[in-house]
Amino acid sequence: LKRCRSKPGCGKFEKLVYGRIPMMVTANCLLNTTGSCLPDNDSTIILTDRYRKDFPVIRICRHCMNIIYNSVPLSLHQNIKEWHGKTDIRLDFTIETGREAIDVLEAFFDRGRLPYDDHTTGHDRRGVE
């Protein structure tokens, strides 16, 4: 971020501080492969793995595809002061109810509690090689 800001032509940045990270986009409908497709019904379904983790799946029937999201949301609410005023922040809401979205906003800006027991900080501290 510091290196890019010193270069001409580098635009504004935003930091994702909350949201479920897409893990996979399928090229076919998960329900269609089981014979239970509901056309034009962009509903959310849940995949459960062998460790009993639930992965939300958003169906996009128009394109016969799905987006599989991480079982826990990314949340950098504990480090929000690091980014305040340095860049724009973004909170992505995908499967949250209205009440959950309000609770998340309060956790970020009013020091409330997240509506989830578990979350990930992704690669925020570790980086990627």
Q: Language-model features: where?
A:
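Active-site pocket-lining/capping segments in soluble small-molecule metabolic enzymes
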Residues: 1-129
